[in-house]
């Protein structure tokens, strides 16, 4: 199953692509990308999110009045009559200040990325600003960890 998790934004969106093998319960990071949706954002969003033909797209819930909410509605509509499931989840990290949540996200990303790819150093050297890719990575990983917990619960 191909999972695309997205850190929504106009200037600095990022997305992580995972391959989740539910027979062996293994997760592999296929790609992690940053983009720019400032010009012709609808086309850019559609291009980025269909590049890897995902089975599931994970989006982080936005505030009611957030300008990024329109992107969520666009993505849900874009995939409405398709085989791609769109899931909107609460943020991975809660509480504390915005700055502390971003730091926590980056720390967890740096700690865990090598478990899912052999290209940790390439990724860390490619991006100077890690918070967006860290958020997309952690959002996808959080979703897959919840799938694994459900599998373990149902097997007992």
UniProtKB/Swiss-Prot annotation:
Q: Which GO terms describe its molecular function?
A: crossover junction DNA endonuclease activity; four-way junction DNA binding; magnesium ion binding
Annotated cofactor note: Binds 1 Mg(2+) ion per subunit.
What keyword terms does UniProt attach to this protein?
Answer: DNA damage, DNA recombination, DNA repair, Hydrolase, Magnesium, Nuclease
Q: Which cofactor does it need?
A: Mg(2+)
Q: What is its EC number?
A: 3.1.-.-
Q: What class of enzyme is it?
A: hydrolase
Q: Entry's Gene3D superfamilies?
A: Ribonuclease H-like superfamily/Ribonuclease H (3.30.420.10)
Which Gene Ontology BP terms does the record give? DNA recombination; DNA repair
Q: What does this protein do?
A: Nuclease that specifically cleaves and resolves four-way DNA Holliday junctions into linear duplex products.
* UniProt record similarity statement: Belongs to the RuvC family. Poxviruses-type subfamily.
| Protein name listed in UniProt | Holliday junction resolvase
